[in-house]
A protein has these predicted regions:
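Structural core segment of the AMP-binding/adenylate-forming
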Residues: 7-89, 481-485
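A short helix-loop-beta submotif of the ANL/AMP-binding
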Residues: 1-13, 17-21, 29-35, 151-152, ...
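Conserved ATP-binding/catalytic segment of the ANL
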Residues: 340-347, 352-407
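Conserved AMP-binding/adenylation subdomain of ANL enzymes
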Residues: 133-152, 159-258, 271
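Conserved C-terminal "lid"/linker of ANL adenylate-forming enzymes
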Residues: 430-432, 481-521
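Conserved pre-ATP/AMP-binding loop-to-beta segment of ANL
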Residues: 83-85, 91-114, 121, 146-152
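Adenylate-forming
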Residues: 359-361, 394-423, 452-474, 495, ...
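Conserved AMP-binding A3 loop
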Residues: 110-136
Length: 521
């Protein structure tokens, strides 16, 4: 759909369904959109926004999943002039009424991507065609030599996500093959009577966000721990041995891959050569685990405002202590942040990450105030992330300005870093770490992983028929707190970063039932 729009020099705008009805209404009104394309399951979400947004004349939906006729009827009732059709009907219409391409210019706006704003109102990040091309070039200069026409990329992240947008276009540039999956059907455990998306498609490249990789890791550990003592000892012994071999450069890891880790690799299709984490920080332990048990996991860093450019790891320069090289299409500098003691003159150099280059947005759509606050007159975008450079010139993120909270003892803690560590605990399905200036330590609000919670309840002789009942049990709450505190200590957190309390929620977090989101969700 986006390529069809580009062929006619049309600008697209993307918005997450998690922005809610108000966010959707804002993006439609601000862009004065004439058409909207969505999943059929979201047709009902359009009803209230379209009562006020009268510029929309076309509602298009894809053919993946069933739609409810009542939603279509309601939309027609709201606006009788609406044209509503599915993707196949649209394609058939195009085949019968072909038009010549109208290629865009590099300075034309390709996409307006809406992200959560600091005031609650979504911000539209305006990205030109030259920004997208420069981003693909930046990715290619680092990992292009490892990827070619024979590679397969499994795509399943929202297409409103800048990481997905860039990598899909990059895959086409490399001549690779894309397979579209769904986060809910990735693994065999998520489906019945068929293979999961990963094993069916057998990708060679898999890009994911921290929450996906934590789920993969926990799934592997769960299966290993469910095996016999011999299986458990063999797995953990092999993992330790491979770590030693890899760190010393000694041969022999291939034998362990063929004998011990083969079943795990087969569960991911058996063809994976590169895993990549993006969209947020991942626990070192998880990155190392995936790299040893499956295939090397590289890291990437970027923002919507920089068209996903920031840092990207070269697979042959693997490390779990930094994000990687600076892409060729941007430049980065570290700017002093005195409040927390970060200075470019520190050893190593530290400060707020500022990025400049062709991939960087020239401003937020119809939002001069946010643009002036975020972008300097000479084109530097202020990311709000605190970084440092290592001896190899690789970028490492150590904090985030907005997530730095000064506690009662006067010291700063970084909430995003804490969330990445505590998320690695088997008990955690989702998490938000909270701190305030009149308390000495943070607390955590979590959605527990149901199997792990029930297992912990049984170990502590806590009775409860449902997760709704278990999350309110005080004895179990104490046990969960100990699990999280142990994970924090194992992850290298300092004393002031160890949570002193936990609140459990039985419900999955959605825009409809909560008024906050964790920073790395």
């Amino acid at each position: 759909m986006s390529h069809g729009a580009v062929s006619q020099s049309l600008t697209i705008a993307t918005a997450y369904d998690t922005l809610g009805e108000e966010g959707l209404k804002h993006s439609l009104m601000q862009t004065e959109a004439k058409a909207i394309f969505c999943d059929p399951g979201l047709l009902g979400t359009l009803q209230n926004p379209l009562k006020e947004v009268k510029e929309v004349k076309f509602v298009l939906y894809n053919n993946v999943g069933e739609y409810k006729q009542e939603h279509v009827d309601k939309l027609k009732e709201i606006n009788p002039d609406l044209t509503i059709m599915n993707f196949e009907e649209l394609r058939d219409l195009g085949e019968k009424n072909s038009v010549d391409p109208v290629p865009p210019d590099p300075d034309d706006v390709c996409c307006i991507m809406y992200t959560s704003g600091s005031t609650g109102t979504p911000k539209g990040v305006s990205l030109k065609h030259k920004a997208v091309l420069a981003s693909i070039a930046g990715v290619t200069t680092i990992i292009g030599k490892y990827i070619g026409p024979g590679d397969r990329l499994l795509t399943y992240l929202p297409q409103a996500h800048i990481l997905e947008f860039v990598f899909e276009n990059a895959c086409l540039f490399w001549g690779g093959t894309m397979g579209y999956g769904n986060p809910k059907t990735l693994s065999d455990a998520s489906v019945r009577n068929c293979k999961g998306d990963i094993r069916e498609f057998r990708p060679t490249i898999l890009v994911g966000v921290p929450q996906v990789w934590e789920s993969v890791k926990k799934g592997i550990i769960g299966k290993v721990n469910a095996g016999s003592p011999i299986v458990r000892n063999m797995f953990w012994g092999a993992l330790k041995a491979k770590s030693t071999l890899m760190s010393t450069g000694l041969p022999g890891s291939g034998i362990l891959d063929a004998v011990v880790f083969k079943k795990i690799r087969d569960a991911t299709g058996g063809q994976l050569r590169v895993c990549m984490n993006g969209g947020g920080p991942i626990a070192k332990d998880t990155q190392r685990f995936i790299s040893l048990a499956i295939t090397p996991m590289i890291s990437g860093y970027g923002l919507t405002e920089t068209t996903a450019m920031g840092a990207l790891m070269d697979p042959l320069h693997w490390t779990d202590s930094a994000l990687g090289d600076i892409p060729s299409s941007i430049e980065i500098k570290l700017v002093d942040f005195p409040d927390a003691g970060y200075y470019a003159t520190n050893k190593p150099p530290q400060g707020e990450v500022w990025i400049r280059g062709t991939p960087v947005t020239e401003g937020y759509f119809k939002n001069e105030k946010e643009t002036a606050e975020s972008i300097t007159s000479d084109g530097w975008f202020k990311t709000g992330d605190i970084g440092e450079f290592d001896d190899n010139g690789h970028l490492k993120l150590i904090d985030r300005k907005k997530n730095l909270v000064k506690t009662l003892n006067g010291e700063y803690i970084a909430l995003e870093k804490l969330e990445s560590v505590y998320r690695s605990a088997p008990i955690t399905a989702n998490i938000c770490v909270y701190a305030q200036s009149d308390k000495t330590k943070p607390i955590a609000i979590i959605v527990p992983a149901e199997p792990a919670l029930k297992k912990l309840a049984a170990e502590n002789k806590v009775e409860g028929a449902s997760i709704e009942e278990l999350v309110h049990n005080k004895k179990l709450n104490s046990a969960v707190l100990k699990e999280l505190q142990s994970a924090g200590k194992a992850g290298g957190l300092q004393g002031i970063e160890i949570i002193e309390g936990v609140v459990m929620s039985a419900d999955e977090w959605t825009p409809a039932n909560v008024s906050f989101f964790p920073s790395t969700m």
